[in-house]
């Protein structure tokens, strides 16, 4: 059932767009989502798991199983964004580049972090000086996540060294 939902919500609109683009190259491109991962925060196989669901994966890892992450691509404005900076961040950025070849330096225009579970922010480590050494990569966060990143290492080092630039979000309800 979940594969049907995945195909109908993500793959089919993208495939439809690609097919129609071939038929009519003047078709206006539209923003779209790309599923870059759908596995729980701890990865796959899950650390310490000895159940049958993980046993095969310990022996034969599946390189397609990545921690939950979405890419948003806007081909009109040549922008891309990623939702969650997971432990699989480098591979997910590479996958996103396939859909957004216009990405400057391979880093999207922004990263949205939804909450402070380890699988949603730990990939920020790859933006530091020991790895990519990015410069002011925009990271969109709610106030609690902003406080967490600013007050805790090594994440505050990314802010202090200007590897990332926090973009505060607020929860506003419009009536």
Task: State where each predicted segment sits.
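Binuclear metal-dependent hydrolase catalytic cores
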Residues: 8-10, 14-175
């Amino acid at each position: 059932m979940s594969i049907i939902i995945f195909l109908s919500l993500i793959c089919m609109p993208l495939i439809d767009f690609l097919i129609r683009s071939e038929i009519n190259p003047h078709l206006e491109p539209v923003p779209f989502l790309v599923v870059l991962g759908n596995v729980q925060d701890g990865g796959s196989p899950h650390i310490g798991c000895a159940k049958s669901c993980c046993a095969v994966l310990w022996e034969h890892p599946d390189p397609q199983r990545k921690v939950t992450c979405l890419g948003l691509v806007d081909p009109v404005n040549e922008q891309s964004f990623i939702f969650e900076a997971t432990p699989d961040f480098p591979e997910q950025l590479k996958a996103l580049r396939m859909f957004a070849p216009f990405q400057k330096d391979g880093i999207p225009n922004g990263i949205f972090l939804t909450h402070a579970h380890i699988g949603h922010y730990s990939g920020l480590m790859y933006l530091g000086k020991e790895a990519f050494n990015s410069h002011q990569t925009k990271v969109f966060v709610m106030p609690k996540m902003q406080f967490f990143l600013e007050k805790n290492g090594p994440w505050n080092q990314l802010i202090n060294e200007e590897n990332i630039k926090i973009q505060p979000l607020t929860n506003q309800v419009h009536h």
